[in-house]
C-alpha cells in the first residue's frame, strides 16, 4: 500500500529533516551555496493523476544532474540507441561524477556512462538543432511536455554562475573533442549544458516526470505515450546503475528504485508501475546526494515496500 495521505508524508519529512544537519549545501557553484540546508520537500505522483506532497513542494529548484536523464531521453529519440552508445558507454564508474580519470585510461576514450559529467556533455552534444539556442529550446519544450507544465524555464543567475565556474567541465569537453567524441564549439556546448542544468521545477513537476518513467513513458493524466518504451527502460536502467553517483550500489540495496540525484538536492524516483517521486533537500552528503532526501527514501522504501529487488 503506497502513501495516500499528505499527513503521512509530513510525519516522514519531520523525521528525515533531522539528518540535514549532517551535510552541507553545494559550495562550488556560488548561486547554490545560498540554499537553506534544513529545507526538505517531497511529492508523489500516481498513474491515476493524483498526487500527495509535504514540505515546500511549490518551491522551485534547479535540476542539475537530474537533467542528464532527460537529455539522454531526447538524444535517444533524436539519434537512436546505436548512435548514442558509439559515443557514450553503458557501465557504472566508482569515480566522482566530474572525474577525468577514466577518460584518460580507457580505450577508446569515451565516457563510461551518460550520468557522469563527461557522458552527459557528450549526450547533450547529440541533441538535434541548428544552433545551441534551438537545441536548448527543444530540450525545454520536451521537459515541459513531460511535466505538463508550460511555464518551466531556467534560472539565468545559476546558469551564468555555472558557466563562469565550469573549468573542469570545459577540460572534459576539450579532452573529448581531441578524441573525436565531440566536434562542436566548446563554449556553445558549455552554454547549452549549463542552461540545461539550471532548468527549474518543483517537487510536483519532478514527481510527474518520475511517474512518466515509472509507467514506461506513458502520461499519467492523458494516457498518451510521451516516450518510447525502450527509451524509458534505458533511462531507468541507468538511474539504477549510475543515478546516485558513486553511491548507486548502496542506494539500490537500501532503497531499490530507479532514481537520479542532483547537487541542488533534488532526487527524482520512478517506482515501476506505481508512482513517481520528487524530493528536494539541499544538504548533501560526501557523495553529492541529498542526505535527508536519501533518509526519507529509505524510510519510504521500508514503509511502503518500494524496492524492486
UniProtKB/Swiss-Prot annotation:
It catalyses: L-glutamine + H2O = L-glutamate + NH4(+). The keyword Ion transport does not apply. Substrate binds at residues 65, 117, 162, 169, 193, 245, 263. GO terms for biological process: glutamate biosynthetic process; glutamine catabolic process. Keywords: Hydrolase. It is an enzyme of class 3 (hydrolase). It comes from the Bacteria. Disulfide bonds: none annotated. One of its GO terms (molecular function) is glutaminase activity. Its EC number is 3.5.1.2. PANTHER family: GLUTAMINASE. Homotetramer. Belongs to the glutaminase family. This is Glutaminase. It comes from Shouchella clausii (strain KSM-K16).
